[in-house]
């Protein structure tokens, strides 16, 4: 029997640190010789969800597509690291149920901190009304109620957050 795969789903506002954290965890897992794939929400949107906008229905569909790919990889023993805002609790719960082996990581940073980190200028554009349906500004973000891991990236270092995720993978039996 092969190794058990798992999906680690990093959720949080734009600029909270999801991509940085998932890439850091990926490096640690690769150093252990483990099969790992990172599914970054921005890249998935560019390649698998180009036609989708940012309505609630389109965001939900994008998350479902990410979940579909993650589930296939997880089933084949891969550790899948998903980095996606995925703002709606019900849709995250839906993909959790679909995938089964699932660890939710809430990458928690205050809106003000996310705006300060905004290298793409998206928050500024959203506040100016140039981008509509922007999560945290004119569209809601529903924080997880019971995530397995909470990383407060305004207070904790990235290495501390990586350690929390690695500890969760160990405690749930996905790593030795």
Swiss-Prot record:
E.C. designation(s): 2.7.1.25
Highest taxon of the lineage: Bacteria
InterPro entries: APS_kinase, P-loop_NTPase, Sulf_AdTrans/APS_kinase
GO cellular component, one term: cytoplasm
Pathway assigned to this chain's UniProt record: Sulfur metabolism; hydrogen sulfide biosynthesis; sulfite from sulfate: step 2/3
Catalytic activity, reaction form: adenosine 5'-phosphosulfate + ATP = 3'-phosphoadenylyl sulfate + ADP + H(+)
GO terms for biological process, alphabetical: hydrogen sulfide biosynthetic process; sulfate assimilation via adenylyl sulfate reduction; sulfate assimilation, phosphoadenylyl sulfate reduction by phosphoadenylyl-sulfate reductase (thioredoxin)
Keyword Magnesium: no
Keywords carried by this UniProt record: ATP-binding, Kinase, Nucleotide-binding, Phosphoprotein, Transferase
Active-site residues, Swiss-Prot/TrEMBL: 86 (phosphoserine intermediate)
Keyword field contains Metal-binding: no
Residues that, per the record, bind ATP: 12-19
Molecular functions per Gene Ontology: adenylylsulfate kinase activity; ATP binding; sulfate adenylyltransferase (ATP) activity
Family of this protein: Belongs to the APS kinase family.
Physiological role: Catalyzes the synthesis of activated sulfate.
Name by which UniProt lists this protein: Adenylyl-sulfate kinase
